[in-house]
Amino acid sequence: MSVPTHQQDLIALLEERGFVHQCTDRDGLAAHLAAGPATAYLGFDATADSLHIGHLQGLMLMRWLQKAGHRPLLLIGGATTRIGDPSFRDSSRPILTEAQIQANIDGIARVFSRYVELHDDSLVNNAEWLDGVGYLEFLDRVGRHFSINRLLTFDAIRQRLDREHSLSFLEFGYTLLQAYDFVELSRRRGCTLQLGGADQWANIINGVELSRRQGGAQLFGLTMPLLATSDGRKMGKSAQGAVWLNAERLAPFDFWQFWRNCDDRDVGRFLALFSELPMDEVRRLGALQGAELNEAKVVLANAATALAHGEHAARSAADAARGVFADGTRDSGLPMMKLSRARLAQGLSLTDLLLEHAIQPSRSAVRRLAAGGGLRLDGTPVSDPDAPLAGEVDGLRLSLGKKQHLQLRLED
């Protein structure tokens, strides 16, 4: 593909692909990026050991910036994770231990490396400067520049209070910490651009303003639209749970299936955001109708899976899907469900198995699925899921409806 250089209007390209919601100074940022390589940062708190597809838009945006010659900084909030961003949340996050935070940082870094070429200095932890700053020093350096009256006007704070939900002083101070992060990254690393979701707008503006009030560099902020599927679901979730970006939490086959099964109305938009296809091809694929649109969904699934898990995983997932839906053959590309010979000998049923693996929420849900013909072993409907499994089950394909398929694997 043709990769833009930093001399071109990168903002126009990002707008065309659907990445831009708001910008603190659109023309100023376009000129700044055209003037030469800039340093941009994207921040995440280390609340889990992976990221999910709700974070994917930001990773792809950072990828485009790096392709255009700009320098990525990926900030993981080792310090701010202890507090939790209250933006548009109804309750406080649980407090994590230092060991949990570090394990999460390690997991997130592995996901980053799939999308952005990391160098030794690409990954930053805000504990580097926040752990060493004293409370009185922080109030003097940062607190003096913020008005409580103005902070109370921000949507994230106001909505929490309007709903009469508790907001601790710890959480109230989060926006000041994020503003300080931006200024410190500007001072230490020459960072001039912060990226974030639309819910981060107030936090980003505060960083831009703090730098100005302290006589620092001119900083810029760019937010992305908060994505939802056309049927109203928040990006990051599926009916089965979070759609994670690492294979340990979600099998590449299930990741591929998420994209293959997306709503027809989302195909063009998702291709623009989550693939690197030229926009002419995106528009062509997005305009397909009927059965032809399924071809576009396969292109989307292959592209998104190749970025998250590699080309081999994408091909294996596509091959596995063809095996399931076309000729009914078994395929090792399916996610495995393990069961022990000892449990099988004790009279393990399919209902037991699905509940133990948290695939179904209740016995009644399994029975309803079976009654509707949606529970099958190697294509054969299971009429009584409560009956003990019998015969040779190793390698059998277990299907739950039309879109969820697993391969049984027997272990000693």
Swiss-Prot record:
PROSITE patterns: S4 (PS50889). GO terms for molecular function: ATP binding; RNA binding; tyrosine-tRNA ligase activity. SUPFAM superfamilies: Alpha-L RNA-binding motif, Nucleotidylyl transferase. The keyword Membrane does not apply. It catalyses: tRNA(Tyr) + L-tyrosine + ATP = L-tyrosyl-tRNA(Tyr) + AMP + diphosphate + H(+). It is found in: Cytoplasm. This is Tyrosine--tRNA ligase. Signal peptide: none annotated. A motif ('KMSKS' region) lies at residues 234-238. Its EC number is 6.1.1.1. A motif ('HIGH' region) lies at residues 46-55. Belongs to the class-I aminoacyl-tRNA synthetase family. TyrS type 1 subfamily. ATP binds at residue 237. Residues 348-411 form the S4 RNA-binding domain. Catalyzes the attachment of tyrosine to tRNA(Tyr) in a two-step reaction: tyrosine is first activated by ATP to form Tyr-AMP and then transferred to the acceptor end of tRNA(Tyr).
